[in-house]
From Swiss-Prot:
Top enzyme class: translocase
Compartments where found: Cell inner membrane
Cell membrane is among the record's keywords: yes
Name assigned to this protein: Ion-translocating oxidoreductase complex subunit A
One GO location term (cellular component): plasma membrane
Gene: rnfA
Membership in a protein family: Belongs to the NqrDE/RnfAE family.
Membrane topology: Multi-pass membrane protein
Length: 193
């Protein structure tokens, strides 16, 4: 149990996918202008990352390794992610049409989110078992969602702040992301791997 807690804390805070590994920057910058959109994208990404992580582990363990097809790992994981995203899109469309309209093009773009593929590949490279893969996928998604929501809240405040003209828009957003990354560096000694 302690191992899973350390994996969770380490993935969410110490090795955050957005601020440390720089994966998932496209939705991080694109969907974080409004808090409600960031929360919706965070929830959708959490569902996709967790499910894709587990499915990718199963495809690798039960199909690719026994058949000696490990060279098809990236292609197989992309196909798994595409299926999971399509399933998620159907669920979101049926359960919350308003959220589906808010997320717009970003929901299908989860397929090309490098964080999702990165989690799947890192699970295999770090030799995680089934449960560790599920925890790692959920933790990566929780870290992604946490950073997204924090960043969206800051960007909403910056939208009404008196920011100098040269720094308005994406300039102040990048500066804010850099400062958030520095703040998360404070968690570096929290968990030793």
């Amino acid at each position: 149990m302690t191992e899973y807690l350390l994996l969770f804390v380490g993935t969410v805070l110490v090795n955050n996918f957005v601020l440390v590994k720089f994966l998932g920057l496209c939705p991080f910058m694109g969907v974080s202008k409004k808090l409600e959109t960031a929360i919706g994208m965070g929830l959708a990404t959490t569902f996709v990352l967790t499910l894709a992580s587990v499915c990718a582990w199963m495809v690798n363990s039960f199909i690719l390794l026994p058949l000696g097809l490990v060279y098809l790992r990236t292609l197989a994981f992309i196909l798994v992610i595409a299926v999971v995203v399509q399933f998620t899109e159907l669920v979101v469309r049926k359960t919350s049409p308003a959220l589906y309209r808010l997320l717009g093009i970003f929901l299908p773009l989860i397929t090309t989110n490098c964080a999702v593929l990165g989690v799947a590949l890192l699970n295999i490279n770090q030799s995680h078992n089934f449960m560790q893969s599920a925890v790692y996928g959920f933790s990566a998604a929780a870290g992604f969602s946490l950073v997204m929501v924090l960043f969206a809240a800051i960007r909403e405040r910056l939208a009404v702040a008196d920011v100098p003209a040269p720094f308005r828009g994406s300039s102040i957003a990048l500066i804010t992301a850099g400062l958030m990354s520095l703040a998360f560096m404070g968690f570096t000694g929290l968990v030793k791997f």
